[in-house]
Protein backbone atom coordinates (compact mmCIF):
# COMPACT_ATOMS: atom_id res chain seq x y z
CA UNK A 1 0.00 0.00 0.00
CA UNK A 2 1.32 3.43 -0.97
CA UNK A 3 0.70 6.18 1.58
CA UNK A 4 0.55 9.06 -0.87
CA UNK A 5 -0.23 11.62 1.85
CA UNK A 6 3.20 10.85 3.37
CA UNK A 7 4.83 11.30 -0.03
CA UNK A 8 2.96 14.58 -0.40
CA UNK A 9 4.28 15.87 2.94
CA UNK A 10 7.84 14.89 2.04
CA UNK A 11 7.67 16.69 -1.31
CA UNK A 12 5.86 19.77 -0.06
CA UNK A 13 8.09 20.36 2.98
CA UNK A 14 11.16 21.59 1.03
CA UNK A 15 8.90 23.70 -1.19
CA UNK A 16 7.49 25.45 1.87
CA UNK A 17 10.98 26.11 3.23
CA UNK A 18 12.11 27.42 -0.16
CA UNK A 19 9.02 29.63 -0.40
CA UNK A 20 9.88 31.23 2.94
CA UNK A 21 13.49 31.79 1.87
CA UNK A 22 12.85 33.17 -1.63
CA UNK A 23 10.58 36.05 -0.64
CA UNK A 24 7.23 37.30 -1.87
CA UNK A 25 8.22 37.67 -5.51
CA UNK A 26 8.75 33.92 -5.96
CA UNK A 27 6.03 32.86 -3.51
CA UNK A 28 3.37 32.45 -6.20
CA UNK A 29 5.41 29.81 -8.05
CA UNK A 30 5.85 27.63 -4.95
CA UNK A 31 2.20 27.98 -3.97
CA UNK A 32 1.10 26.79 -7.40
CA UNK A 33 3.51 23.85 -7.14
CA UNK A 34 1.94 22.88 -3.82
CA UNK A 35 -1.55 23.41 -5.26
CA UNK A 36 -0.77 21.10 -8.20
CA UNK A 37 0.54 18.34 -5.94
CA UNK A 38 -2.44 18.80 -3.62
CA UNK A 39 -4.78 18.51 -6.59
CA UNK A 40 -3.09 15.23 -7.54
CA UNK A 41 -3.43 13.91 -3.98
CA UNK A 42 -7.13 14.79 -3.79
CA UNK A 43 -7.72 13.39 -7.28
CA UNK A 44 -6.39 10.01 -6.19
CA UNK A 45 -8.84 9.87 -3.28
CA UNK A 46 -11.79 11.08 -5.37
CA UNK A 47 -10.98 8.67 -8.23
CA UNK A 48 -10.88 5.76 -5.81
CA UNK A 49 -14.15 6.81 -4.16
CA UNK A 50 -16.03 7.30 -7.45
CA UNK A 51 -14.69 4.04 -8.88
CA UNK A 52 -15.98 2.20 -5.80
CA UNK A 53 -19.37 3.95 -5.85
CA UNK A 54 -19.87 3.38 -9.58
CA UNK A 55 -18.41 -0.14 -9.39
CA UNK A 56 -16.20 0.75 -12.33
CA UNK A 57 -13.62 -1.63 -13.73
CA UNK A 58 -10.01 -0.58 -14.35
CA UNK A 59 -10.68 0.68 -17.89
CA UNK A 60 -13.73 2.74 -16.92
CA UNK A 61 -11.93 4.24 -13.93
CA UNK A 62 -8.90 5.13 -16.06
CA UNK A 63 -10.61 6.42 -19.19
CA UNK A 64 -13.90 7.83 -17.86
CA UNK A 65 -13.47 8.88 -14.23
CA UNK A 66 -9.82 9.89 -13.88
CA UNK A 67 -9.63 12.43 -16.77
CA UNK A 68 -12.72 14.30 -15.55
CA UNK A 69 -11.67 14.37 -11.90
CA UNK A 70 -8.04 15.27 -12.56
CA UNK A 71 -8.73 18.10 -15.01
CA UNK A 72 -11.40 19.57 -12.73
CA UNK A 73 -9.06 19.42 -9.74
CA UNK A 74 -6.32 21.17 -11.71
CA UNK A 75 -8.79 23.84 -12.77
CA UNK A 76 -10.01 24.70 -9.25
CA UNK A 77 -6.87 26.50 -7.95
CA UNK A 78 -6.61 28.30 -11.28
CA UNK A 79 -10.20 29.56 -11.09
CA UNK A 80 -9.62 30.68 -7.50
CA UNK A 81 -6.56 32.62 -8.67
CA UNK A 82 -8.57 34.23 -11.47
CA UNK A 83 -11.51 35.20 -9.26
CA UNK A 84 -9.48 36.60 -6.37
CA UNK A 85 -6.44 38.22 -8.03
CA UNK A 86 -7.61 38.89 -11.63
CA UNK A 87 -4.11 38.33 -13.10
CA UNK A 88 -2.81 39.26 -16.54
CA UNK A 89 -2.84 36.78 -19.41
CA UNK A 90 0.79 35.63 -19.16
CA UNK A 91 0.46 35.03 -15.42
CA UNK A 92 -2.61 32.84 -16.03
CA UNK A 93 -0.70 30.71 -18.53
CA UNK A 94 2.32 30.37 -16.21
CA UNK A 95 0.08 29.39 -13.29
CA UNK A 96 -1.72 26.72 -15.33
CA UNK A 97 1.57 25.19 -16.53
CA UNK A 98 3.05 25.21 -13.01
CA UNK A 99 -0.01 23.44 -11.58
CA UNK A 100 0.02 20.87 -14.40
CA UNK A 101 3.76 20.28 -14.07
CA UNK A 102 3.66 19.74 -10.31
CA UNK A 103 0.60 17.48 -10.72
CA UNK A 104 2.51 15.33 -13.22
CA UNK A 105 5.63 15.27 -11.02
CA UNK A 106 3.72 14.03 -7.98
CA UNK A 107 1.88 11.45 -10.09
CA UNK A 108 5.15 10.13 -11.54
CA UNK A 109 6.79 9.90 -8.11
CA UNK A 110 3.84 7.91 -6.73
CA UNK A 111 3.93 5.64 -9.79
CA UNK A 112 7.65 4.96 -9.31
CA UNK A 113 7.23 4.17 -5.62
CA UNK A 114 4.30 1.83 -6.29
CA UNK A 115 5.65 0.04 -9.38
CA UNK A 116 9.42 0.33 -9.06
CA UNK A 117 12.00 2.01 -11.28
CA UNK A 118 13.82 -1.00 -12.70
CA UNK A 119 12.62 -0.63 -16.33
CA UNK A 120 14.48 2.49 -17.43
CA UNK A 121 13.20 2.71 -21.02
CA UNK A 122 9.55 2.39 -19.99
CA UNK A 123 9.94 4.86 -17.11
CA UNK A 124 11.75 7.29 -19.41
CA UNK A 125 8.96 7.30 -21.99
CA UNK A 126 6.24 7.37 -19.35
CA UNK A 127 7.86 10.28 -17.52
CA UNK A 128 8.10 12.40 -20.65
CA UNK A 129 4.69 11.33 -21.96
CA UNK A 130 2.75 11.92 -18.74
CA UNK A 131 4.53 15.19 -18.07
CA UNK A 132 3.93 16.46 -21.60
CA UNK A 133 0.27 15.39 -21.51
CA UNK A 134 -0.42 17.32 -18.30
CA UNK A 135 1.55 20.34 -19.53
CA UNK A 136 -0.33 20.26 -22.85
CA UNK A 137 -3.65 20.23 -20.98
CA UNK A 138 -2.33 23.11 -18.88
CA UNK A 139 -1.38 25.04 -22.01
CA UNK A 140 -4.84 24.50 -23.49
CA UNK A 141 -6.65 25.62 -20.34
CA UNK A 142 -4.23 28.38 -19.34
CA UNK A 143 -3.86 29.87 -22.81
CA UNK A 144 -7.59 29.69 -23.38
CA UNK A 145 -8.49 31.25 -20.04
CA UNK A 146 -6.08 34.11 -20.69
CA UNK A 147 -8.26 34.93 -23.71
CA UNK A 148 -11.76 34.06 -22.50
CA UNK A 149 -11.53 35.78 -19.12
CA UNK A 150 -10.88 39.11 -20.83
CA UNK A 151 -14.41 38.87 -22.22
CA UNK A 152 -17.23 38.64 -19.68
CA UNK A 153 -19.65 36.85 -22.01
CA UNK A 154 -17.08 34.12 -22.69
CA UNK A 155 -16.01 33.31 -19.13
CA UNK A 156 -18.40 30.49 -18.27
CA UNK A 157 -18.82 28.98 -21.74
CA UNK A 158 -15.13 29.34 -22.52
CA UNK A 159 -14.05 27.73 -19.25
CA UNK A 160 -16.40 24.76 -19.80
CA UNK A 161 -15.21 24.36 -23.39
CA UNK A 162 -11.54 24.43 -22.42
CA UNK A 163 -12.16 21.96 -19.60
CA UNK A 164 -13.95 19.65 -22.05
CA UNK A 165 -11.02 19.84 -24.50
CA UNK A 166 -8.51 19.01 -21.76
CA UNK A 167 -10.65 16.10 -20.50
CA UNK A 168 -10.98 14.71 -24.04
CA UNK A 169 -7.23 14.84 -24.64
CA UNK A 170 -6.57 13.27 -21.25
CA UNK A 171 -9.09 10.48 -21.91
CA UNK A 172 -7.60 9.68 -25.33
CA UNK A 173 -4.16 9.44 -23.72
CA UNK A 174 -5.45 7.00 -21.09
CA UNK A 175 -7.33 4.92 -23.68
CA UNK A 176 -4.21 4.50 -25.81
CA UNK A 177 -2.20 3.44 -22.76
CA UNK A 178 -4.91 1.00 -21.68
CA UNK A 179 -4.87 -0.57 -25.16
CA UNK A 180 -1.20 -1.44 -24.67
CA UNK A 181 1.42 -2.46 -27.21
CA UNK A 182 2.51 0.10 -29.80
CA UNK A 183 -0.48 2.32 -28.97
CA UNK A 184 0.96 2.83 -25.50
CA UNK A 185 4.16 4.32 -26.90
CA UNK A 186 2.15 6.40 -29.37
CA UNK A 187 0.34 7.84 -26.34
CA UNK A 188 3.64 8.72 -24.68
CA UNK A 189 5.06 10.30 -27.85
CA UNK A 190 1.96 12.22 -28.98
CA UNK A 191 1.86 14.90 -26.22
CA UNK A 192 5.61 15.53 -26.60
CA UNK A 193 5.23 16.00 -30.35
CA UNK A 194 2.18 18.26 -29.93
CA UNK A 195 3.98 20.47 -27.40
CA UNK A 196 7.05 20.65 -29.67
CA UNK A 197 4.90 21.47 -32.72
CA UNK A 198 3.04 24.18 -30.80
CA UNK A 199 6.29 25.72 -29.58
CA UNK A 200 7.74 25.68 -33.10
CA UNK A 201 4.60 27.31 -34.53
CA UNK A 202 4.70 30.02 -31.85
CA UNK A 203 8.39 30.65 -32.60
CA UNK A 204 7.74 31.02 -36.33
CA UNK A 205 4.81 33.37 -35.74
CA UNK A 206 7.01 35.47 -33.45
CA UNK A 207 9.69 35.71 -36.14
CA UNK A 208 7.16 36.84 -38.76
CA UNK A 209 5.92 39.63 -36.50
State the predicted function of each range.
Residues 1-209:
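Hydrophobic alpha-helical segments at protein termini of multi-pass membrane proteins
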